[in-house]
Amino acid sequence: MCPRETPGALGMLTKIPNMLTIGRIVAIPLLVVALIFLEAPLANWIAFTFYTLACVTDFFDGYLARALGQQSAFGRFLDPIADKLLVASVLLVLVGVDRISDVTVLPAAVILCREILVSGLREFLAEVRVPMPVTALAKWKTTIQMLALGFLLVGPAGPEFGPLSTTEVGVIGLWGAALLTLVTGADYLIVGIRQIAAVDERAADSEEKPGSSPDTGGGKMRKAG
């Protein structure tokens, strides 16, 4: 039994798309350690490099999975987890090094809360076999969010963009991503609530139908008494 399972497990892990997804997870602690323990500006650029590589794998793992016919349940399970680990880790380390501080923590908190909300909704909807497609607006949110976090990782080591520093450009992008996060999060929440209500209705109907015929008379007698 073991010899049959081992090649399957190895094959799953050694598929190129899955290896890229795993590489994205491996890059997370590397960029965190670089930003915290190395000296600036080297720390900023090393962290940015790991982050950029992680973002690139986010595109290519899905693309290659489709192109090579290597789509798998493991990849579908791991890919969104890797994305959320990357976003959450970068936001937290940016707060830790004071790149995000004061009122700028608010959009970071909004983005984190939305990630948790969407994860919960996706898990629930997957159980009832209801797809939760990614909207065009959500893709724009992800793009702006990725760019903003990249600017913030570079921070003071980056160039000036007219009157704005690299950090300020990142902060503006973070606010924009947070705004889109609220809009897309509300859309997902509405869809989720509707599906939850539908599931509850079906459950209530299934509970009423089996007992309705035999208990009708008894129910009336109890009410009358």
Language model: regions and residue ranges:
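Core segments of transmembrane alpha-helices
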Residues: 24-31, 82-93, 118-119, 141-153
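Transmembrane helix-loop junction
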Residues: 35, 66-67, 96-97, 123, ...
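C-terminal membrane-associated helical module and adjoining short loops/tails
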Residues: 1-17, 27-28, 47-55, 125, ...
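Membrane-water interface of transmembrane alpha-helices
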Residues: 114-124
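Hydrophobic alpha-helical transmembrane segments of integral membrane proteins
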Residues: 13-14, 22-26, 76-79
